[in-house]
Amino acid sequence: MDTFLQQLVNGLTAGSVYAVVALGYTMVYGIIQLINFAHGEVVMIGAMVAFTVINALAPTGLSPLAVVLVGTACAIPVCMLVGYSMERLAYRPLRGAPRLAPLITAIGVSILLQHLAMLVWSRNVLAFPQIINNTSYTLGGASITNVQIAIIAVCVALMGGLALLVYRTQLGTAMRATAQDPHVAGLMGVDVNRVIAATFVIGAALGAVAGVLYGTYYGVAQYTMGSILGLKAFSAAVLGGIGNIPGAMLGGVLLGLVEALGAGYIGDLSDLCAYGWIADFMSEQCAAAGHFILFGSNYQDVFAFLVLILVLVFRPSGLLGERVGDRA
């Protein structure tokens, strides 16, 4: 039971980050039906910028919280600029092109941003500054740290803030109108180009914060970190229903839980070595290591992509998505 509760805590923490990143995918897709595969690299840039700023400010004597906040405050505008430039220079000229063209462009932008980051920060795995001391609390047999609590709280606040923006503001109304029908929205006075640009900028800002949270939680940053993180967040968006904001939130949390529970419970087959033909079949592995691991924490990515495959096969519209026909 304690293990189950611990994996729930770990899954909620990781899933909260996935949910925030997934919002960037689902917002863009909801507006222009584009899967922005470069969004993971925006998250990576946010983590890298924060890494640089936090490293520079850590020896100055500022409080750890202030240092992290300044690092995040520096990462957000940089990522917003990257997101705006991406939309303005790479995607807007292709808005009327066949859907495959912007998709290929998104992959190209992703590779470009990766290599630019490699030139700036090197190809090495960077140790993200751990300047906030971890304090553990016991919750029903599970251990949860102050960092995990902060990550979950920040992600919940971001998701709540985005929901208010989308459903309670004039910009949100314009975004929903553009998602429904850009042509009609334009006829009604909505500046469609500005709304689309704002969507990219908001998604990039969320990605910047997610990058800082991810680096703080896992303690590492690298120029390739956006690839797997981005694909996991995309899986979360598909799981919840791509283009559906509540679906992205739900999908992110569920994906984090599936990963954590899968890594925690599936994989240690050591007990099977004691039984009959299984012992004979795996005797070499058991004799060499004393146990046989099929999955586990080293293979937790498998569970994320298995979820993606299963959803695409059995429910392509996602948990909260609606099946709609192609636009005329």
What is each PLM-predicted segment?
Residues 47-52, 75-82, 107-117, 154-163, ...:
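Hydrophobic core segments of alpha-helical transmembrane domains in multi-pass membrane transport
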Residues 61-109, 116, 250-255, 259, ...:
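Alpha-helical transmembrane segments within multi-pass membrane transporters and channels
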Residues 18, 68-73, 200-207, 214-305:
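Transmembrane alpha-helical segments in multi-pass inner-membrane proteins
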Residues 1-21, 49, 60-69, 97-101, ...:
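Membrane-interfacial amphipathic/re-entrant helices at transmembrane-helix boundaries
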Residues 143-224, 245-251, 255:
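Helix-loop-helix "hairpin" substructures at the membrane interface of multi-pass membrane proteins
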Residues 4-53, 85-101, 237-246:
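Single transmembrane alpha-helix segments in multi-pass membrane proteins
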Residues 93-94, 99-168, 195, 219, ...:
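Transmembrane helix-bundle core of multi-pass membrane transporters
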Residues 9, 31-85, 89, 220, ...:
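Membrane-embedded helix boundary and interhelical linker motif in transport proteins
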